[in-house]
Amino acid sequence: MKKSNNKNNHKNNHNNNQGGENIRVRSPRRGEIPGVVEQILGHGKLKVRCNDKQIRLCRIPGKMKKRIWIREGDVVLVKPWDFQSDEKADVIWRYTRTEANYLERRGFLKI
């Protein structure tokens, strides 16, 4: 296997979405609702305004706490609990600005 001499090879492989390239976005599946973070409450909890006009108390699962930082105004994907589904949910995905714009254009995000 031939090794490349170009030390900056990783820079050549970046996906630049400004050129009209296709992007892959995780779309909401059954039982998942997109929403916007309204307030960070601490201890891994957030208030999220969901697409169905409900404000839910959402928690960030342990596997996401240190890997993904969530701020107010971020677009997230939440999965309501089986019980208290109108009040509580888990955050399962955070979208980037580009992905959020794509969701809004496609009609998934109606906030």
From Swiss-Prot:
CDD domains: S1_IF1A
Basic residues bias locations: 1-13
Pfam short name (any one): eIF-1a
Annotated S1-like domain residues: 23-96
Region span, Disordered: 1-30
Record's keyword terms, sorted: Initiation factor, Protein biosynthesis
GO molecular function: RNA binding; translation initiation factor activity
Disulfide bonds: none
PROSITE patterns: S1_IF1_TYPE
Stretch forming the signal peptide: none
SMART domains, sorted: eIF1a
SUPFAM superfamilies: Nucleic acid-binding proteins
Job description of the protein: Seems to be required for maximal rate of protein biosynthesis. Enhances ribosome dissociation into subunits and stabilizes the binding of the initiator Met-tRNA(I) to 40 S ribosomal subunits.
Annotated family: Belongs to the eIF-1A family.
UniProt protein name: Translation initiation factor 1A
Organism (species): Methanosphaera stadtmanae (strain ATCC 43021 / DSM 3091 / JCM 11832 / MCB-3)
